[in-house]
Amino acid sequence: MNTYLLRTSLAVLALSLLGGAGAAADLSLERIHADPPLAGRLPRQAEVSPGGQWVSFLRPSQADSEVLELWAQPSDGGEPRKLVAAADLLGGAEQRLSEAEKMALERRRISQRGITGYQWCGSDDRALLFPLSGDLYRVRLTAGGPQAQKLALPPGSPKLEARCSPDGKSLAYVQDGNLFSLPLTDGAKPTPLTRDGSATVSWGLAEFAAAEELARQRGYWWSKDGRSLLALRVDESGVAVKTRAQIFADRTALTEQRYPAAGEANARLAAFVIDASTGAQRELPLPAGCSRSRATRPG
């Protein structure tokens, strides 16, 4: 009898708990899509710094999970700390993205705003580089805390695909289809490494087929000593122009872009070794077939 009563009591308790859980689990469609996300504010692009002192990552803002901030945590323990947020640098201004930047983020499957990418600059674990609203910023890790500074570069079109040299003494970037190098010293001016960039010719950028089909998001690479770069020149003049729809929350727009449809022409590629100081170029022969947008990556 006691066993029967015990089993009955447990059954009643289980049913009551299930009923409560069912009531608590009721979610509206609005809550499912509201902020904060039910899965939590998950970090992305986690990296260990070159010297192993830090673990860096992008973290959604507490105010808006669609805005990413740059954070880091000591690798030997300690609390994570925010290094910089877009709002700290833009001063209330709205973040700007060019069409080229939007397409690059789309190819990386990134829908958030704010600081959407970064890299460690050099091997001493003291500086990181990131793009924001068409400009480039460097944040230094100092004894007094992180200090972010916008790099003094010529105004105009956004600086794309910025990458520091392995020693952290220089960086390269793409602007208006051309590749530039810049020593990271006070008062230094960028050096144009190429000059024939145009609406159909670009240097140092991954074209559509490379990014979508070959998982190659880069178009140039620094040498280990930081003295030269391997860069791809992309000629899309033979790629057909297609019209595609862009769907926004409140409207739909039509835009034209060069799109290598199946069975049609791809972009033509050429590879060059470029001196980072002078821009002197030496063309490298590509394997058969790679000249038509089928180069994967060095090595």
Give the location of each predicted region.
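Bacterial N-terminal signal peptides
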Residues: 8-19
